[in-house]
């Protein structure tokens, strides 16, 4: 069973590259994948989408790293979908 299926929280990030950026679209996406890989969390990557999974705080920090890397590389946006397992502690208000 992949690690992301057992994780407390998983986040799916879709990089929306910009054609007008200095770096080509593929480099914008690769920047996100590299950042995700460097987090050390369980991750899976597709053409423009990647999933990071782990503890809640770890995933939030990883999302920030991936978003920053994507935007720094010229991406126009990053869409994020976060899912928590049923027994995961919720954010306290």
Regions found by a protein language model. Name each.
Residues 1-93:
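Charge-rich, low-complexity N-terminal segments
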């Amino acid at each position: 069973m992949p690690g992301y299926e057992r994780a407390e929280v998983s986040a799916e990030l879709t990089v929306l590259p910009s054609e007008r950026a200095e770096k080509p679209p593929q480099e914008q996406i690769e920047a996100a994948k590299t950042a995700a890989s460097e987090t050390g969390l369980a991750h899976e990557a597709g053409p423009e989408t990647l999933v990071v999974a782990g503890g809640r705080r770890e995933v939030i920090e990883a999302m920030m790293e991936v978003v920053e890397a994507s935007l720094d590389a010229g991406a126009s946006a990053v869409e994020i979908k976060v899912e928590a397992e049923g027994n995961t502690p919720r954010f306290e208000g």
